[in-house]
């Protein structure tokens, strides 16, 4: 009986400590208003970026978008990057 009671109390104590540690970690990872740019840069490094490509017609009318060509056609370049 005593062993079961000790096991239950130990398990409850571990659960409380784990929950408290998880809440503290979550609070430390939240961004605050007025956060310096250096801290924001660290947050941005962890995020992935998706970049879209825009194409502009240089000389030859309505051709499909191709990679950079040296003579006429379409010229493609990165347009913008979006955080995911």
Curated annotation (Swiss-Prot):
Superkingdom per UniProt: Eukaryota
GO cellular component: extracellular region; host cell postsynaptic membrane
InterPro entries given in the database record: Hwtx-2-like
Pfam families according to UniProt: Toxin_20
Protein's name in the database: U4-theraphotoxin-Hhn1aa
Record function comment: Postsynaptic neurotoxin.
Statement: the UniProt record of this protein carries the keyword Transferase: no
Transmembrane parts of this sequence: none
Protein family: Belongs to the neurotoxin 12 (Hwtx-2) family. 02 (Hwtx-2) subfamily.
Keyword Signal attached: yes
Gene Ontology molecular functions: toxin activity
Location of this chain's protein in the cell: Secreted
The organism of origin for this protein: Cyriopagopus hainanus
Tissue expression: Expressed by the venom gland.
Signal peptide as annotated in the record: 1-22
Bridged cysteine pairs (disulfide): 51-65, 55-76
Alphabetically ordered keywords of this record: Disulfide bond, Neurotoxin, Postsynaptic neurotoxin, Secreted, Signal, Toxin
Pro-peptide positions on chain: 23-47
Main location: secreted
